[in-house]
Amino acid sequence: MALSACSDWTDTESINLAEPGIDEQSPELYAKYLKNLQEYKNSDHKIVYGWFDNSEKVPFSRGQHMSDVPDSLDVIIVTTPDLVEFELKDIVSVHEKGTKVFYSISYDNILKEHTDKVKEGTETSTFSAYLSAELNRLIALEAPFDGIVAEYRGSNPIYMSEADKAEAKANQDTFFSVIANWKSANSGKKLVFQGYPANLIGQSVLSSCDHIILITNDVTDVAQLGIEALQALMADGVPADRFIVSASTISLDTTDKTTGYYNALRALSEAAYWV
């Protein structure tokens, strides 16, 4: 018996499969769809925001592209403002659908970063100096975006000592003065506040904000949405005509019947009905 084999190796080769989308299959129909979508988003309707984790800078699935989020979103808020080339192209794509792209500047995240770095021994500056430097760095990234979400949760000043209250106000002044200066220089862009209005000390920023996003993504029933709104309105200078409530989507874990639910009901749909 004789055995034989091929003497040449056969190398595997990846093949790029590009399935045509509706924009290529029917350009005229897609153009009409975009026109109708843009007209709707420019009309008077309930505004829908969505947060998008764009931390993956070498995407390996369509789910990591802003251009593949649902067209129904009015605003995408990215978690990382440092963008790479494919993300800039994605922004152009979603703009064609009338979707805006914002990024968030979080006071509380900056505070946590400074605290952690001080503990690690990698940061020696005061928080005030660190806050100013970080704000300047983040504001410098604003060019590709349609707006900024200024996030401030903080602590309730009612329970602060006078010294702590003065320090909190000084830090708020630093934070919101940079935000306000940016808004003054960019009147065509949007400013949104996210956080607890009751924790602001002598700040007038809310009157300049297009929307106020309340921290409600962890409430457990729809009645608490009204409670959060009433608590926000108890603070001085809070406009009542621009609240946005937040709700979580359901978990990918099918056994999790808590995340994204108000009791047994979907939180997203119930929050939409409440608005």
PLM region spans:
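Substrate-binding cleft of secreted/luminal carbohydrate-active enzymes
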Residues: 241-275
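N-terminal carbohydrate-binding/catalytic regions of secreted carbohydrate-active enzymes
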Residues: 43-105
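Hydrophobic faces of well-ordered beta-strands that scaffold small-molecule active sites
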Residues: 48-50, 74-78, 101-105, 148-150, ...
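Aromatic- and acid-rich polysaccharide-binding/catalytic face
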Residues: 76, 197-225
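Aromatic-lined carbohydrate-recognition surfaces of secreted/lumenal glycan-active proteins
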Residues: 47-49, 172-201, 214-218, 239-253
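Acidic (Asp/Glu)-rich catalytic clusters
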Residues: 65-70, 85-103, 137-144, 201-207, ...
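Substrate-binding cleft of extracellular glycoside hydrolase catalytic domains
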Residues: 81-171
